[in-house]
Amino acid sequence: MIVFDHVSKVYPNGTVGLDDVNLTVGDGEFVAIIGRSGAGKSTLLRAVNRMHRITAGTLTVNGTDVSTLSGKALRQFRRGIGMVFQSFNLVTRTTVIKNVLSACVPDMPFWRVLLGAFRREDKLKALESLDKVSILDKAYMRADQLSGGQQQRVALARTLTQSPRIILADEPVAALDPVTAKQVMQDFVHINQEMGISI
């Protein structure tokens, strides 16, 4: 559950990003925030995983006051929250599966990261995530050979591989054509309904 209780965010230059926001998102809910450009939608999302610090109020996620987290506790907290952005943030000159496996890197010993030695269970989980977004057949293709919609699905599969309880999607279909955008949104709905992940 995500609870904004009188949350405000004022940037150092004086710009108000959020002004006394009260909002509760229950476990497993699918919520869309709609508003004009500059209304604070991205600020609201980024406050949830503490990419932005709030300046007033209380923000709790699954009972944890986000503003109290730092260091290792903050990194661990963020592992439970997946982010999907408008830009896909893929390494386009490598394979789809390697992009998805990058979700496992924070939990790996340094030597495994250095050698690219992913565990069998990590590989199986990555393949399972690709299957959930209907692009398992693209696993060993280079990411730059995929369409925009397919690349966004790779980003979503990468997020699923980290086993999040919450997925925050910041304009995930803004760069896609209407037909592809609808397909990607259907993937989000399917994941929400089948896996109970809050989106």
Where do the language-model regions lie?
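A short, proline-enriched helix->beta-strand linker immediately N-terminal to the Walker B motif
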Residues: 161-165
